[in-house]
């Protein structure tokens, strides 16, 4: 197992800052091509060799000069490394459902504190950065439970509340207030010429989301190259379609008593992953290849 990590981002392919004049667009619908990205940037980084093993983290996050890796399934899931000294400060948060334990943790997009969402228990934990990166078992500053359980989604901060993907037919997202109460169904599913059952629709538009924490929300889709931009009230502002203009088609099937959904092999393609807002820019990983 390696002790080093390369701080190098080579897979960020798309940056959405503004729409160029040659893009086809109306008030809400914008199409773009690969050729619309006029500038190609090469990102470079350096290798930091730590004094302890780096496992195989499912997530990493920076808090000031500390790198925190999330290692789901490890005895203690968060490992804290000091970037300045290359020293491992410690580990924290055992697997479990106790007051200081988590089952399936995910980082929430905050930089003023450490906020972590446990999907399995639909619980949001907030810590001060110094407390969480001390190398000891941290004491949380707040712990709230969402009233929708379980919520198998990344959670993002939006205003004074939290937003997650719903995986329900009513809307693509759920908005929660700072107490964990669901306050609204957020957004609407895109219109499609394909006739879908509710379950097929949810699978066709499986999504991830990100926010700028204030007033903008971007919902990106795993199996269609479509990005939907909403305001804080859940009103659709723009749809960005491209660069390849495709949509994977899903169909229900029955196997005995089991009803499932699967994509048509002729249309099954990967689209967007891991969206992140940085200031007024939206970064996203894009694939575009057929799923085999």
Residue ranges and their predicted role:
Residues 237-275:
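Flexible internal linker/loop segments at domain or repeat junctions
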Residues 29-55:
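A short helix->beta-strand "capping" segment at the edge of beta-propeller domains
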Residues 56-61, 105-110, 152-158, 200-214, ...:
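Structural signature of eukaryotic scaffold interfaces centered on beta-propeller domains
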Residues 83-85, 129-132, 177-181, 231-235:
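Short loop/turn segments that connect beta-strands within beta-propeller blades
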Residues 15-18:
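C-terminal motif of bacterial Sec signal peptides marking the signal peptidase cleavage site
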Residues 120-122, 128-159:
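Asp-box/WD-like beta-propeller blade repeats and closely related beta-sheet repeat scaffolds
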Residues 46-77, 273-274, 281-290:
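Beta-strand-rich domains and repeat architectures in extracellular enzymes and scaffolds
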Residues 87-121, 142-146:
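Blade-loop segments of beta-propeller domains
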């Amino acid at each position: 197992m390696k002790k080093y990590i390369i701080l190098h981002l080579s897979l960020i392919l798309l940056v959405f800052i503004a729409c160029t004049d040659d893009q086809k667009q109306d008030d809400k619908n914008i199409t773009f091509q690969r050729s619309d990205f006029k500038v190609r940037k090469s990102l470079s980084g350096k290798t930091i060799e730590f004094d302890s093993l780096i496992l195989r983290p499912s997530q990493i996050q920076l808090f000031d000069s500390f790198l925190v890796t999330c290692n789901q399934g490890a005895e203690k899931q968060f490992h804290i490394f000091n970037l300045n000294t290359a020293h491992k400060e410690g580990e924290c948060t055992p697997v479990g459902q106790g007051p200081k334990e988590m089952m399936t943790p995910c980082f929430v997009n905050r930089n003023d504190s450490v906020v972590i969402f446990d999907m399995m228990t639909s619980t949001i934990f907030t810590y001060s950065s110094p407390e969480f990166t001390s190398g000891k078992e941290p004491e949380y500053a707040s712990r709230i439970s969402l009233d929708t359980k379980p919520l198998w989604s990344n959670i993002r901060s939006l205003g004074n509340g939290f937003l997650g993907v719903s995986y329900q037919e009513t809307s693509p997202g759920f908005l929660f207030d700072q107490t964990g109460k669901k306050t609204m169904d957020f957004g609407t599913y895109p219109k499609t010429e394909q006739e879908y059952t509710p379950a097929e629709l949810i699978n066709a538009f499986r999504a991830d989301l990100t926010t700028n924490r204030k007033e903008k929300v971007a919902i990106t889709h795993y199996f269609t190259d479509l990005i939907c931009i909403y305001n804080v009230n859940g009103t659709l502002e723009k749809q960005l379609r491209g660069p390849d203009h495709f949509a994977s088609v899903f169909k229900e099937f029955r196997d005995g008593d089991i009803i499932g959904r699967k994509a048509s092999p002729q249309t099954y393609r990967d689209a967007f992953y891991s969206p992140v807002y940085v200031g007024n820019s939206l970064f996203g990983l894009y694939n575009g290849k057929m799923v085999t």
